Amino acid sequence: IPEASFYWFEDDVLCKCRPDIICKPQGPHQDYEIVVVDYKTTYSCSPESFKESVLKYGYAEQAAWYRRGMEAAGYKVKEFVFVAQEKKPPFASKVFKITNEQMDVAWLTMEEHLHAYMRHLKGEKPTVYNSPNVVTLDLDVQD
């Protein structure tokens, strides 16, 4: 299923996810199991480079968000994979996946962001505004 939108409520907040592709495994008793595929363009498909992109852009948290949306729709996400393709010739591509343990950590981070957003909607200012105006940075400078 390409680019289907899924909507659900978290308390009173309307939420949405739109995975690039949803694949349903073939076989009995697998009607609600799915594999979610997310397409990403990148400058390099090397594992080290794509890992940096995953960390920099929060792709793991996005995967957790999509999983949450799919579960709200009644599906069980069997696997989440990224199809990464380079932006320049030869347009190399590679498939990456995150482990269940990594997904669990991303899920917790995503939940923190969601709850912070819900608190913001109720009028609470983000914690960055509740901190001192002057913060001393501890820079680890090597000689």
Question: Where on the chain are the PLM-derived regions?
Answer:
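Glycosyltransferase-associated regions of secretory-pathway enzymes
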Residues: 11-17, 25, 43, 131-142
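A generic structural motif
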Residues: 7-9, 22-26, 83-85
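Short, catalytically relevant binding-site loops at active-site mouths
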Residues: 8-9, 42-45, 65
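Short, solvent-exposed loop/turn segments that connect beta-strands within catalytic domains
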Residues: 10-12, 27-33, 74-76
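Conserved beta-strand scaffold positions in the cores of enzyme catalytic domains, especially
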Residues: 2, 36, 80-82
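Metal-dependent nuclease catalytic regions and adjoining charged, substrate-binding loops involved
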Residues: 53-60, 65-143
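Conserved catalytic cores of phosphodiester-cleaving nucleases, focusing on short active-site segments
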Residues: 17-52
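A short acidic/basic microdomain associated with nuclease active sites
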Residues: 1-11
